[in-house]
Design a protein with these regions (language model features):
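Terminal alpha-helical segments
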Residues: 1-237
């Protein structure tokens, strides 16, 4: 199987990859359901999580078609996104979250905990290990319980259904140059800007002038001030 880095940076290639991922997700959901029916709950849980990951990968690849694929930094970040289990899981929930924003507001903490549980439960559902608290060996069948496995299989099926609807009815978002730059920006650099009070003074002035695009504000601030060692407040005071 080709490694992700060997994918051609073209919309056609990413479209084909997205279609393959969603088909594989459907197969994984079917297989997870069969395992649950035969009470192989640990393996059912593992395959259900894998199905959610593949669903998320399909969505990442779909949205990637609207980015500047000729930019090496953007494409490198895309490879990182569809190769990361956590990002895949988060992306798998995006269609359902987008259609029920009120539920997101009410259940934000529960949703965050659910995504974390899926990320953390993946490996214990497949591999034996030594518990860190008492140094005892544990089997996946001892860790994953029936309710958790069946719930995870249903969740995988729901994510798949929502993703199929999204992929059928939408076109890839067309991202601006600033949005692509923000997407490719290292997380440490982004968080440094977000934690800089001077940026927020800049952002408030931009918003008051009717320029409320977050990506454009971040990139503009970094180019005009942060990267050249200047302060917005000092320059405008």
């Amino acid at each position: 199987m080709d490694q992700p880095t060997r994918v051609t940076p073209s919309a056609a290639a990413l479209s084909a990859y997205s279609e393959a991922a969603i088909k594989n997700a459907a197969e994984l959901v079917d297989e997870a359901s069969l395992l649950a029916e035969h009470r192989h709950f640990a393996r059912a849980y593992f395959l259900a999580v894998a199905a959610i990951e593949e669903t998320g990968k399909a969505l990442i690849l779909f949205e990637a078609q609207g980015r500047n694929l000729k930019d090496p930094a953007v494409f490198s970040r895309l490879i990182q996104a569809w190769s990361d289990h956590g990002e895949e899981i988060t992306s798998a929930f995006m269609p359902s979250l987008a259609t029920d924003r009120e539920a997101v507001r009410k259940n934000a903490v529960a949703l965050a905990n659910l995504m974390a549980a899926l990320r953390n439960g993946r490996e214990p559902a497949m591999y034996s290990d030594i518990r860190s608290d008492n140094q005892k060996a544990q089997l996946p069948s001892e860790v994953v319980h029936e309710v958790a496995a069946r719930d995870c299989v249903r969740l995988a099926a729901d994510c798949l259904t929502d993703a199929r609807t999204y992929l059928k009815n939408r076109t890839p978002t067309q991202y601006t140059m600033e949005q692509d730059k923000l997407f490719a920006l290292k997380r440490t650099h982004y968080h440094r800007t977000m934690n800089n009070p001077d940026f927020w003074w800049f952002f408030v002035e931009e918003a008051e002038a009717g320029r409320i695009d977050h990506a454009a504000a971040v990139i503009s601030y970094r180019d005009k001030f942060e990267l050249v060692g200047k302060s917005f407040r000092k320059e405008t005071s």
